[in-house]
Swiss-Prot record, chain A:
Family note: Belongs to the phosphoribulokinase family.
Originating species: Arabidopsis thaliana (Mouse-ear cress)
Cited InterPro entries: P-loop_NTPase, PRK, PRK/URK
Any one Gene Ontology BP term: reductive pentose-phosphate cycle
GO CC terms of this entry: apoplast; chloroplast; chloroplast envelope; chloroplast stroma; chloroplast thylakoid membrane; nucleus; stromule; supramolecular complex
UniProt keyword annotation of Mitochondrion present: no
Domain of life of the native organism: Eukaryota
Disulphide bond pairs: 61-100
Protein name: Phosphoribulokinase, chloroplastic
Curated annotation (Swiss-Prot), chain B:
InterPro entries: CP12-like, CP12_dom
SMART domains referenced in this protein's UniProt entry, alphabetically: CP12
Protein name listed in UniProt: Calvin cycle protein CP12-2, chloroplastic
Annotated source species: Arabidopsis thaliana
Family: Belongs to the CP12 family.
Summary of subunit composition and partner proteins: Monomer. Component of a complex that contains two dimers of PRK, two tetramers of GAPDH and CP12. CP12 associates with GAPDH, causing its conformation to change. This GAPDH/CP12 complex binds PRK to form a half-complex (one unit). This unit probably dimerizes due partially to interactions between the enzymes of each unit.
Length: 395, 131
């Protein structure tokens, strides 16, 4: 007797369960047969699985372009929680919840001033609470997460976070604490070079009254010792690193407009196969400009090669330069493999869909989109693998 | 600077006029209440209560400007001291918040009805019909 199951997405995110097991939900369905008046009980188990993604970045917590590209690949637009604190740093979509790790500050702005520490210092962050809450969400338990208000500098009343399918923890320290690191199914480090960081902060801050080149430079230099001590070492643990550097196509370029972006992918990560260009494991240098790809100065150059990164075997895919016409990206996409696309041209479609996002014409947009596809693939593989394991356990 | 007693909750969303005669909306209501339901927390944390500064005139732009001046003064003597580094860290945090506020204002188009309808699409005021 076939039984159809109808449930809403909201039901999948429900924390209500009928058994002591916190990792599965059971739905009892009753069906009345027309010939007889007997009722049948059908038991269906809906497994709620949460994967945890860590993203380390210097700033721009929760509202970054990367987050919007990521949640777009997973489906649905991420928005702040409805009816909640308007200063919340959390983003929620149908499948994804993005948590800003600034919410786990143990010192607010005034406490940090008193203690003379930056937000990058581990002493200003509560790693015990971070670990407990990420672990609870991964196990399907909702948490009351604190909210750090970036405007007032104070800790606001907490908000209730339901366990999602994909949990992204984004901020300064997703890979700092070993316990939190072990909870991550995949981790990414955004490695912005000092020159690019300076150029981006000029672009961001010169619109603000009071700022000047001197103040922007002083701010970066003051934070650098703590950044080098507590943030930068995390990249050795990342499964993927996106390095953003000035271009090498323009000699002595100091504008920071044209970027060279490297996607460094670790080999041997479970459920993750690195992307490759032309032939897996080969060394490629490729200028795709010609009849199929329009390029203006300074052009585009791709590199692909195996390498070593912190004594770990990696594959590196690099793009220097920028696209003139995004619709022609399909030509480049057709030469990349292991993209985990569901149909031909999905990368190009995603890029065109968000052509207005910053970085859409250079490697940052391309590699962020590719990482989003790899995370979706990782989620699907992990869910399928757990389903298989459960089926085998029953046998 | 006036201070407000701890626990007093003020939520305000007002239009301020800056020195350039431009109306500036705060990014959202500013919640100054720093007390919360401690019983709901999963761990015990010692929270030191302290006076809260009132929402400053001119919104976050003025706060950024003040923090930059303060950082420059703090760092005049010893640029590698803890006070100096913490002061510039505050500038960085406030600059990022100001940037987000600008982006949000740009994205929302400063239309309060659109903002309201985003959060409450089911209400009568927000209904649209295709025919």
């Amino acid at each position: 007797m076939a039984v159809s199951t109808i449930y809403s997405t909201q039901a999948l995110n429900s924390t209500h369960f009928l058994t002591s097991s916190s990792s599965s939900k059971q739905v009892f369905l009753y069906r009345r047969q027309p010939q007889t008046n007997r009722r049948f009980n059908t038991l269906i188990t809906c497994a709620q699985e949460t994967i945890v993604i860590g993203l380390a970045a210097d700033s721009g917590c929760g509202k970054s372009t990367f987050m919007r590209r990521l949640t777009s690949v997973f489906g649905g637009a991420a928005k702040p929680p409805k009816g909640g604190n308007p200063d919340s740093n959390t983003l929620i979509s149908d499948t994804t919840t993005v948590i800003c790790l600034d919410d786990y500050h143990s010192l607010d702005r005034y406490g940090r001033k008193e203690q003379k520490v930056t937000a990058l210092d581990p002493r200003a962050n509560d790693f015990d609470l971070m670990y407990e809450q990420v672990k609870a969400l991964k196990n399907g338990i909702a948490v009351e997460k604190p909210i750090y208000n970036h405007v007032t500098g104070l800790l606001d009343p907490p908000e209730l976070i339901q366990p999602p399918k994909i949990l992204v923890i984004e901020g300064l320290h997703p890979m700092f604490d070993e316990r939190v690191r072990d909870l991550l199914d995949f981790s990414i480090y955004l490695d912005i070079s000092n020159e690019v960081k300076f150029a981006w902060k000029i672009q961001r801050d010169m619109a603000e009254r009071g700022h000047s080149l001197e103040s922007i430079k002083a701010s970066i230099e003051a934070r650098k010792p703590d950044f080098d001590a507590f943030i930068d070492p995390q990249k050795q643990y990342a499964d993927a690193v996106i390095e953003v550097l000035p271009t090498t196509l323009i000699p002595d370029d100091n504008e920071g407009k044209v970027l060279r972006v490297r996607l460094i992918m670790k080999e041997g990560v479970k459920y993750f196969s690195p992307v490759y260009l032309f032939d897996e494991g080969s060394t490629i240098s490729w200028i795709p400009c010609g009849r199929k790809l329009t390029c203006s100065y300074p052009g585009i150059k791709f590199n692909y090669e195996p390498d070593s990164y912190f004594d770990h075997e990696v594959s590196v895919l690099e793009m220097d330069g920028q696209f003139d016409r995004l619709d022609e990206l399909i030509y480049v996409e057709s030469h990349l493999s292991n993209l985990s696309t569901k149909f031909y041209g999905e990368v190009t479609q995603q890029m065109l869909k968000h052509a207005d996002f910053p970085g859409s014409n250079n490697g940052t947009g391309l590699f962020q989109t590719i990482v989003g596809l790899k995370i979706r693939d990782l989620y699907e593989q992990l869910i399928a693998n757990k389903a298989t394991a459960r089926a085998e356990a029953k046998a | 600077m006036a201070t407000i007693a701890t626990g007093l909750n003020i939520a305000t969303q007002r239009v301020f006029v800056t020195s350039e005669n431009r109306p500036v909306c705060l990014a959202g209501p500013v919640h100054l209440n720093n007390s919360w339901n401690l019983g709901s927390r999963t761990t015990n944390r010692m929270m030191k209560l302290q006076p809260i500064k009132a929402a400053p005139e001119g919104g976050i732009s003025d706060v950024v400007e003040k923090s930059i001046k303060e950082a420059q003064e703090t760092c005049a003597g010893d640029p590698v001291s803890g006070e100096c580094v913490a002061a510039w860290d505050e500038v960085e945090e406030l600059s990022a918040a100001a940037s987000h506020a600008r982006d949000k204002k740009k994205a929302d188009g400063s239309d309060p009805l659109e903002e309201y309808c985003k959060d409450n699409p089911e209400t009568n005021e927000c209904r649209t019909y295709d025919n």
